[in-house]
Amino acid sequence: YIYIGSVVVLSYVLFLSWNEEKEIKQEFAEASFIEQNKSEELLPPGETVGFVQIQNEKLDVLISPSSGKVWQARLKEHTYLNNDESQGVRVFGFDLLSGFKFYLNSGFVSEGDGFDVVGVTPSSISLISLDGKISKTISLKEGDYELIIQDSWVGEVPADTPTPYVAMYRTDGRALDARDNFFENSSYTGVAFNTPDEPYANTRLRNIDERVEYFQRGGWVAFIQKYFMAAIITPSDRAQTLIALPPSNGSDTYVMGAISRETKVSEIMSGVEHRVFLGPKVRSDLISRAPDLELTIDMGWFWFLAQPLMMLLSMINVLVGNWGVSIILLTFLVKLLLWPISAKGFSSMAKMRTAGPKLKEIQERYKDDRAKLGTEMMALYKKEGINPAGGCFPLLLQMPVFIAFFFCLRESVELRHESFFFWIQDLSAPDPFFVLPVIFAALMYLTQQLNPQPPGMDPTQAQIMKFMPVMIAAIFIIMPAGLVLYSVANSAISLVQQKAMYKKYGASDLPGPGAN
């Protein structure tokens, strides 16, 4: 019943979750980012003609040398498909067929009208604006997921000090290279801000219908998708406005970024630096990059349980080197820690099962006198030391652990494309041959045979309960194999524990509800 409740709740959550830039001509107070009218040749993915390519061990980036825009960023170590031939997942990118685009630009408000290339290295590009006023360098940190942009003013700075900005531009729609399935689309996709008053404030693009802005020092603005994200990380001492803007002037593009304020002339001349993270949402890595950046990993309602569970899972994986085995070992450890609670529930059910024949006799004797039936049943419970709710409440306390495990495994990029054994080659994807859901259904059926039938359950309800293993297995068909593996391990261990407790109370040889 605990699984039924948990799976139904989580299925409901999943159901709910499923259900251009023109150069800036306004003054700072009215600055807005609008789709640029200048035509730029957009090439199909995989083609680099017309773009400059820079790369390091983690990222492969395409930059337009004429505008300085970062048009594409691929993650080399995270492929779209689970094979060696597949290309890396795109964080930034475009799709000519659908019109989808997600890119980044930076510079000075109302300044810059095209660039020329000054120099190129394997991991960087240097540009100068056509009017010679702005110098731009875009580089990749060695062996890292960060893009570093440096915008500098060349020559004398005007009295009206130019305002630096950095922004991401995105049309609404499903993330590039995301698997199109129910479970994949259930994760949060949208904008997130880090502010002094709210460490993690998020909203979906379609909900942005007016200008959103936060005046502050430091912080970050990010666009989050399942497993990966793009985040603009600002210096803690820089005064700025974090913004999100809806489409305007006929554009279909949303904007999220940062506009610097109170920028010193010396800083503009030496170069305003922007950090942009483009990579996987690995908690330990995000913690080291910026305060509260790890909050972009959605650990759900029971995050205080999910976070330590993920830490334990990672520690176990370091020792055994297999995420599937790690899930089984962590499940065993959790069941061991929860044994005192489970034991109370199992002992109560064992006593109920032992008293089953007497209870059935009372029900037959007083079937026409419900008042007397209730009195005699309560007298039997008192005599045998049975608490009718004793078997449910301790197990109910374990539901938060199951839900925490659900979010932990759903959001963990560490499990993406990680194999277990044999047919399971991706723990983040559903079991391709439905073996684990079938095993779970069998274990759930065996567990039902052990559990005493609740008093007063009508025959129709009893028949529905018999088909519950099949219904839960059907739901598990679309769940990640890692989560189903946890459920199988949890059910198997619970079954062993329950049989041991029944043997202790002499209830093993008594007929269960299936025999009745």
Ranges and model annotations:
Residues 28-50:
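Short extracytoplasmic/periplasmic juxtamembrane "stem" segments immediately C-terminal to an N-terminal membrane anchor
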Residues 39-41, 48-49, 125-126, 248-250, ...:
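Intrinsically disordered, low-complexity segments enriched in polar/charged residues with Gly/Pro
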Residues 55-295:
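Soluble non-transmembrane domains of integral membrane proteins
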